[in-house]
């Protein structure tokens, strides 16, 4: 076996060596030298002794066989000769593997022969202190330099570039100590460490990269810096990372968290030449704590910024109260939100109470003292005296907990702005009160039934139940309610509950007895509500008393025959037709109006008797028919045989099937033919009355060209008696005479057209032509009365649809009224009438303006001027029909006639719809 010498007692226990040669030399060497090796000629160790032999590491399982001397070596001193030099008489400094933290370095003397069998004696003195002190100082200086680099590099780097700076530091460590990979891990305080930054040499493959995460227990496999190797016991850390060897340097950070440096060396020899474990420990703890402090500082700044932002957004913040000084310290945002001044944000309790409503201020003082006395939490809602910028009350919520004791006794907590919540709560309470009042006063009964194990248990009935049934249903069971159901309706009542639980919705009708025993027909509609898990929780429904509807249905059934007879014999024209205008029903009155029988009319199309325009409008209305209600058409004109016409005021109601599609239309017509004829006669009479008023002006208009003709004939006679008539002179006079004759002819023709009855058909025409025609008849008369007429040509010609002569009649009536108003005001310096065609802002319309400066219309009379027989003229000067007839004529063309005071006189506006583009183009 190998021999280890620690002392004389240890030597007595040492096994016998292989050889007994030179015992005196061996014994003397053991006492004088730190290490003694007996070597064979193949440089194998036979036995070991000396004062420091106990420090050598011993391999396991070697047995008693000689061991090569090289296995005892840790590393060779730089620049030393080889082992063979010892045999040549040279000295050599060697470092041997030691079982302690510090290596064992010895200076060996040249080998001395021990016997004649080739054995030698190798003697060494321990120089570890000298050698280790030199290496240690060098590594400490290098560690201090790297520590200075760490501090300077991390001092001013921003948090966003912190990982990059740490990576540069790790790269410097890797370059200084020849490492393949190095990583800094920081613990999260939850049992895990994460790689914060790392450096891996190019070309190396390593998992030591962010975001690798390791358990704290894996980094606590041993105490202090240590080398982990697969051959020296199992390591969970090595298996996780997939490395054969790692140098682990745990670092304890402030707060008890764990950090570490994980190093993958280039080789074990390079690691041995690097810093001592305590230097690695120094670098690891310095770097880990610096990085952790920077991260914690950033988190504190970020949390402070977020807290400040949150306090600013919610209008609140933290507070602290010192009981002995009765002084509040407020957060900056809270201090500013309360409108307080002062540098230190400290407010006396009395000052803070002055900001509150008196009742809240007194209560706050009492609650503060009670909380300090009992140690219980403080919570109160406070209302400020001053309203906010919107004039609304401002509410705060103060909450706090006692802290400290003795002179440091106080409270600390938060103060939040709950104004919006209080306003919403007040609105919700008001809405709840309104809703409760509405529910209680509603003509229906609202109820809630709770679902318990498949049963519907009554829970709530609105107060209207007592008004409807004369019963207090609150607290009554489902069985008590079922006993009040009519016996014939019990099956429907039971089926209602099953359908509600199965389908989630139900609608049914049944009879229920009230407090006096009278039966009420109830329409019951309910919906099932479910909880977050989708299970039925309660049913909400309503009862509607439909007793009157049932009685009405019975009465309707009894009188249906009477109503059918009434419809048949009704003086109104009643029919039904499909969306294609095919008649499906016609009453007797309608058939008689069309001079045929109802049977012969069924199946025929309604548009056979209608003009194309009316038929198209009727179809368009059917396409946009409302779902409910009837629509009334002003009039429909039916063309009857013998050039007869039937004017009907038409009211129609669309009927829809279950799918919401139009299936039929029911229409009722009222014969308006006599009224229509009377309107035509009235319009014609008004037209002739206008002609009568224009006689004097027309006489002058006819007399003037006749006078020109007379003068021309006189001149021709004089010329013929004196010098005779030549061709040129005669041609000139004849042309002049012809022009005057044409002038009279146009005037007479226009009078003939104007005096005829208006056509029934609406035709497209230019509305500006009404201005031209009216001025042709009234222009001369207006000029005779010194009335200036302005009629600018329109920038764009428009086309409307209607009767051109009727629009001209309207303009004539408006011009005549303007003339009378101007002549009835003798104080006017000038008399003006302006006719203008104006395009509307609303597309599809055009306006004709007639504006005078005659002083306008009294405001109280504006609403009555279109009434029949109403006039502002003196008695005997007007019929009161001009404006009324004009209003009806414009309305029949689909337009409107309005009057207003504007400027120095009255403004009449005729508003007409433009014709379709196809008609305008035609």
Curated annotation (Swiss-Prot):
**Disrupted gene: phenotype observed:** Mutant exhibits similar responses to carbon starvation stress suggesting that PprB-mediated transcriptional response is not transmitted through PprA.
Q: Which InterPro entries match?
A: HATPase_C_sf (IPR036890), His_kinase_dom (IPR005467), HisK_dim/P_dom (IPR003661), HisK_dim/P_sf (IPR036097), PAC (IPR001610), PAS (IPR000014), PAS-assoc_C (IPR000700), PAS-like_dom_sf (IPR035965)
Q: Which residues cross the membrane?
A: none
GO MF entries: ATP binding; phosphorelay sensor kinase activity
- Listed Gene3D superfamilies: 1.10.287.130, Histidine kinase-like ATPase, C-terminal domain (3.30.565.10), PAS domain (3.30.450.20)
Describe what upregulates or represses it. By carbon starvation. This increased expression is controlled by RpoS.
Top EC class of this enzyme: transferase
EC number of this enzyme: 2.7.13.3
Q: Phosphohistidine is carried by which residues? A: 700
**Pfam families, alphabetized:** HATPase_c, HisKA, PAS_3, PAS_4
Keyword Disulfide bond among UniProt keywords: no
Q: Which residues form the PAS domain?
A: 559-622
Q: Which NCBIfam families match?
A: sensory_box
Quote the function comment for this protein.
Answer: Member of the two-component regulatory system PprA/PprB involved in biofilm formation by controlling the expression of many related genes including type IVb pili major subunit flp pilin, adhesin bapA or cupE fimbriae. Functions as a heme sensor histidine kinase which is autophosphorylated at a histidine residue and transfers its phosphate group to PprB.
Its name, as the record gives it, is Two-component sensor PprA
Organism of provenance: Pseudomonas aeruginosa (strain ATCC 15692 / DSM 22644 / CIP 104116 / JCM 14847 / LMG 12228 / 1C / PRS 101 / PAO1)
